[in-house]
């Protein structure tokens, strides 16, 4: 049973996290690849029975049918299923789909790896997540004894989120979060981007999950770097090398850590939302070889977060400093410690402001698109970046780095 939700090609989950202090956490994690289902020791009808069981679970959750959902489970999983039904009560028109990636049956036990997608009213595309299930044969047939996330849990496994909507936005918020204020801020940020990127088609709707605090955000998305206020995820399918252009965005979402966001001054709150929405808006244009410094440069500039003066001070010895050529490889900012991440964000902002001063915002966006051009290629990421700069802006990487440092 080949997975059907994820088409062939290079599929990855990209995460970018940004904070009011400049500590970010871009990460690239391979998404599970499609594999044929494997069965051992049982006839094919066991596989069919398990597939039917998985479909029953998805339908029961959609309908919030406690009896039907718990009837597919055994042991402690029944209690977790009851809670899931309770905690989806305020997610209107929930739609759930599952597709098996791997099925390994040994005797009366089965291990299942699957992709689950969910959608609530207002979402233009579902969000995908990887699950791992254990099932066992009982006198009543196959039952799920464990259903757990392989990466991030589902929102309703963390808290009873409520869905609210605004034009182009679906916000899931838990108890204790001022959804109205965040929704208003997000709507304003979307309008700002519409004005800043008039030639770009923005996402028809963006899924935003409000985490109450850093602990809840960690439950939803894994490790959260200190200082991160919001982050954006996208699951994308890349095309062939050398361009690695995005062929399809499979899923995308934002997470806002409300406890941190709420403490920021109003201008910084809005800047944070514009920054993360910029990452989301540019998902289709973000090649697999787009330098992390450039991705952050565009988001920092469009959100009005100018750190060019800080970059010059750092280059003069006032603090940690990092060159753009050190920030060309995927994950290069994520791998830095907190102090160095601040330097990386300052350098990225400095680069944006130099480019905009000389070539305008259109020049900055033209450079961004250049990494989708297969004709621009080099033996290393630094060489490719230098060639993209020369081709689009008539500027070398060395010249840009010198200008960022104020030399």
Predicted features along the sequence, with ranges:
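Acidic/His/Gly-enriched intrinsically disordered linker/tail segments
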Residues: 237-252, 267-272, 284-407
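Short beta-strand edge/turn micro-motifs at domain boundaries
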Residues: 21, 124-161
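C-terminal motif of bacterial Sec signal peptides marking the signal peptidase cleavage site
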Residues: 14-17
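Acidic/histidine-rich, surface-exposed loop or edge segments in extracytoplasmic proteins
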Residues: 33-40, 51-54, 162-179
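Short, low-complexity, disordered segments immediately C-terminal to signal peptides
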Residues: 19-44
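Juxtacatalytic substrate-recognition/specificity segment
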Residues: 165-291, 320, 384
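Surface-exposed, charged secondary-structure patches
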Residues: 84-129, 261-262, 274
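Short solvent-exposed beta->alpha transition segments
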Residues: 37, 41-52, 56-107, 217, ...
């Amino acid at each position: 049973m080949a997975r059907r939700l994820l088409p062939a090609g290079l599929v990855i989950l990209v995460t970018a996290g940004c904070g009011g202090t400049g500590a970010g956490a871009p990460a690239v994690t391979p998404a599970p690849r499609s594999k044929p289902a494997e069965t051992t020791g049982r006839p094919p009808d066991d596989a069919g029975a398990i597939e039917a069981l998985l479909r029953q679970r998805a339908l029961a959750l959609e309908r919030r049918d406690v009896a039907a959902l718990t009837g597919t489970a055994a042991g402690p999983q029944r209690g977790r299923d009851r809670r899931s039904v309770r905690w989806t009560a305020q997610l209107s028109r929930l739609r759930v789909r599952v597709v098996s990636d791997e099925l390994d049956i040994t005797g009366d036990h089965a291990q299942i790896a699957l992709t689950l997608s969910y959608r609530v009213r207002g979402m233009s595309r579902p969000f995908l997540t990887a699950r791992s299930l254990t099932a066992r044969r009982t006198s009543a047939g196959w039952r799920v004894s464990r259903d757990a996330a392989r990466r991030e849990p589902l929102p309703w496994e963390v808290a009873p989120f409520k869905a609210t909507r605004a034009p182009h936005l679906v916000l899931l918020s838990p108890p204790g979060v001022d959804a109205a204020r965040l929704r208003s801020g997000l709507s304003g940020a979307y309008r700002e981007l519409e004005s800043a990127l008039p030639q770009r088609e923005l996402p028809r709707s963006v899924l935003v999950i409000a985490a109450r605090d850093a602990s809840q955000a960690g439950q939803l998305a894994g490790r959260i770097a200190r200082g991160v206020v919001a982050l954006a995820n996208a699951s994308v399918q890349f095309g062939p090398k050398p361009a690695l252009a995005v062929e399809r965005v499979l899923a995308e979402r934002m997470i806002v850590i409300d406890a941190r966001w709420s403490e920021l001054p109003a201008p910084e709150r809005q800047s944070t939302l514009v920054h993360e929405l910029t990452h989301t808006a540019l998902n289709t244009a973000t090649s697999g070889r787009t330098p992390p410094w450039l991705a952050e440069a565009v988001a920092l500039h469009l959100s009005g977060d100018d750190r060019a003066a800080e970059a010059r001070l750092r280059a003069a010895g006032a603090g940690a400093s990092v060159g753009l050529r050190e920030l060309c490889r995927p994950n290069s900012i994520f791998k830095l410690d907190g102090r160095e991440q601040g330097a990386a964000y300052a350098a990225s902002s400095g680069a944006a402001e130099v480019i905009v001063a000389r070539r305008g915002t259109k020049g900055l966006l033209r450079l961004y698109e250049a990494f989708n051009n297969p004709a621009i290629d080099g033996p290393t990421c630094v060489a490719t970046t230098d060639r993209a700069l020369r081709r689009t802006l008539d500027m070398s990487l060395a010249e840009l780095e010198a200008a960022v440092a104020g030399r």
